[in-house]
Every structure is written in C-alpha cells, then in structure tokens.
Amino acid sequence: GFFFP
C-alpha cells in the first residue's frame, strides 16, 4: 500500500 497497508 501507499497510504494504507
């Protein structure tokens, strides 16, 4: 993820 896993 980028913002979230």
From Swiss-Prot:
Keywords: Ion transport, Membrane, Secreted, Target cell membrane, Target membrane, Toxin, Transmembrane, Transport. GO terms for cellular component: extracellular region; membrane; other organism cell membrane. One of its GO terms (molecular function) is toxin activity. It comes from the Eukaryota. Signal peptide: none annotated. One of its GO terms (biological process) is monoatomic ion transport. It is found in: Secreted; Target cell membrane. Exhibits unusual shark repellent and surfactant properties. Forms voltage-dependent, ion-permeable channels in membranes. At high concentration causes cell membrane lysis. Monomer. In aqueous solution exists as a tetramer. Belongs to the pardaxin family. This is Pardaxin-2. It comes from Pardachirus marmoratus.
